[in-house]
Amino acid sequence: MSRFLICSFALVLLYPAGIDMYLVGLPRIAADLNASEAQLHIAFSVYLAGMAAAMLFAGKVADRSGRKPVAIPGAALFIIASVFCSLAETSTLFLAGRFLQGLGAGCCYVVAFAILRDTLDDRRRAKVLSLLNGITCIIPVLAPVLGHLIMLKFPWQSLFWTMAIMGIAVLMLSLFILKETRPAAPAASDKSRENSESLLNRFFLSRVVITTLSVSVILTFVNTSPVLLMEIMGFERGEYATIMALTAGVSMTVSFSTPFALGIFKPRTLMITSQVLFLAAGITLAVSPSHAISLFGITLICAGFSVGFGVAMSQALGPFSLRAGVASSTLGIAQVCGSSLWIWLAAVVGIGAWNMLIGILIACSIVSLLLIMFVAPGRPVAAHEEIHHHA
């Protein structure tokens, strides 16, 4: 079992590492490529676009051909793209490399969740996904620090060589440690089971909405945090970094505590708790009379996301034993595109950073609470863990 957990964690971590590792070198990258920092900030969106593009096909291929045939090319593409970015001499080539990096990371991301669906039952999967969420929260804190240390002695290209080394590690795990987990194709007489795993399942769609809104909340917070904390609340850059590190600490603590909570409370209870925390955060930020109260509201956001997201993702994947790859892709596409669309629309309409965050918090909590209470899970699908024996 440990081999599947290690490989899944490694496959997922390429995604946040690709986002956060290079940010510290952005000023030097812009100077060397004769581009403005503003022009290169689009590299974040280009990376997410690459991930979304990968998810359009990676899930289907993973369900038809297996998890390894997607993970191995995905890791290889991430390596090649990282090297390509390090060798880029124009901003156009750099952005092309970032898109390819996103493609590779997207393939690995989809496979990781499919593997967890293949090998774990519902309760254990919820616990593991909560732990994975906590580990993912470490990356935005550690990656810039590691990038800063690297750049003390080496040029910005070394950041992408470091990502390439990470990709090589994932490739080696995928080649030599990971075993195939895709369930055997059903017999012709059992095709009804595969056909019953519809993406239009009400329960699955409800969890797609809940997880997409939750990701929209956390990405809205990350996207608006410089404006909220430095421009509106007046904190210095160093204080901003400290606050963001503390919020990551809250996320990690809650994420690592959630598996223990799942041994006491039902998953539904934790999901309701998550949305109540979002609602409390929205109300707190809306009526806050002081910076201290506002910071408390921000910690509620991090706690709310960490306590509920892994559980919701596990529930979303639950109905799919034969189409876990497609289900994982659908979740990823919805989360990336839905959150990006909200942030873009809010900016176009002219909604301020503060109201943008409050609005998505309250909308997410109300819609999600209604879905949790009125859309019940269907009959659970078995088909996990015994898969190992024919891997």
UniProtKB/Swiss-Prot annotation:
Residue ranges annotated as Periplasmic topological domain: 25-41, 90-92, 152-157, 222-244, 290-292, 352-355
Keyword Transport part of the UniProt annotation: yes
Subcellular localization: Cell inner membrane
Spans traversing the lipid bilayer: 4-24, 42-62, 69-89, 93-113, 131-151, 158-178, 199-221, 245-265, 269-289, 293-313, 331-351, 356-376
Gene3D superfamilies according to UniProt: Multidrug resistance protein D
UniProt keyword annotation of Cell membrane present: yes
CDD domains: MFS_MdfA_MDR_like (cd17320)
Primary location group: membrane
GO CC term, one of those recorded: plasma membrane
Topology Cytoplasmic: residue spans: 1-3, 63-68, 114-130, 179-198, 266-268, 314-330, 377-391
Any Pfam family the entry gives: MFS_1
Gene Ontology molecular function terms on file: transmembrane transporter activity
Membrane topology of the entry: Multi-pass membrane protein
Taxonomy, superkingdom: Bacteria
UniProt keyword annotations, A-Z: Cell inner membrane, Cell membrane, Membrane, Transmembrane, Transmembrane helix, Transport
Similarity remark: Belongs to the major facilitator superfamily. DHA1 family. MdtL (TC 2.A.1.2.22) subfamily.
Entry protein name: Multidrug resistance protein MdtL
